[in-house]
Amino acid sequence: MKIKSFTGLCFLAILGLASCQSESGKSSKENTQTTDSITVVKLVADSFQKEIDGKSTGLYTLKNKNQAEAIFTNYGGRLVSLLMPDKDKKMVDVVVGFKSVSDYQNSTEPYFGATIGRFGNRIAKGKFTLDGKKYQLFTNNGQNTLHGGKKGYQDVVWDAKQINEHTIQFDYLSKDGEENFPGNLKVTVTYTLTDDNELKMDYQASTDKTTVLNLTNHAFFNLNGEGSGDILNHEVEIFADEYTPVDSTLIPTGKIEKVKNTPFDFTTATNIGARIKDNNEQLTFGKGYDHNYVLNKTKAMNMFQAASVKGDKSGIVMDVYTQEPGLQFYSGNFMQSKNKFKGGSKDDFRTAFCMETQHFPDSPNQPGFPSTVLKPGQVYKTSSIYKFSN
């Protein structure tokens, strides 16, 4: 099927109504307009058209019958924008991101909205042993490897195929030895925007050599919209009675501990900021929440609920469903106001959060954790969903 690229101008409302229409041939200059305190951003397709490592990037849009929209670029297999209706039926862009590929390339935080691999989260000291062979990865997070190394999947151009107005497919061949991971790994990520306001993410991979992998999406959310302030009054519920505590470098200790009577207990809906400043060693290590939750599930359950988040101003609810055993809850602790988002606001401290479905961090070195090993002949398949309501 011929690749379909989004070639018009997309008008995004950060805190209000948005519309999208094709306007080929018009100026590609970006500008903003403000009407009744609503900032409208013109996201220009030309700003996402670039050649990187000999491959072309573009902008792609998905729509549903409710006027919801999900906009992607194949640079990093990345979610750029996600428009959902709030309690007043106005459209809100709940994903923070940038207005050009160059902005993503130059960001001090490279993971906004990206597909993460080959191994999401951290591997201690960038080392692991597989089939008796020792591997040393590039360490890009202090002494550890984070999100695949120096050049993870967020920095590559994926092959894009827009199946229809609801679905887009991204493909990438991660070659044997890339970032020192073994095996030629064929990866397919399919994003679908359903008429139930679900953004479904289906991951599939196969390898010709035994390897490890842990795929996820790293969207940064603010359910009140970009520029609406911090996310500390967002209400969070996580369906997990346990979590994996970490050391000072955010590597799991190997223990699995109960969340009860700790600031990590979100088994009932609680504001993110309610206990984030508590005197707790784990919060000190993460500078807030940056921890993996061990999700409550049974073997009989295929897709199960991992979390629910509600925007205090918008009334938008995001329910997270997954087949994965873990969920990384990140409260935007390392956002440093060094980047400007597509609506003009900066990435200020804790103005977005992440809910990353995953296997546990450092699994290749933790025999007590669910395995992340993939062998030739096996097919890696997993799905997660962000479902929105108001």
Placement of each model-derived feature along the sequence:
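An exposed, glycine/acidic-rich loop-and-rim segment of catalytic or binding clefts
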Residues: 21-68, 74-390
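C-terminal motif of bacterial Sec signal peptides marking the signal peptidase cleavage site
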Residues: 16-19
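Bacterial N-terminal signal peptides that target proteins for export
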Residues: 1-8
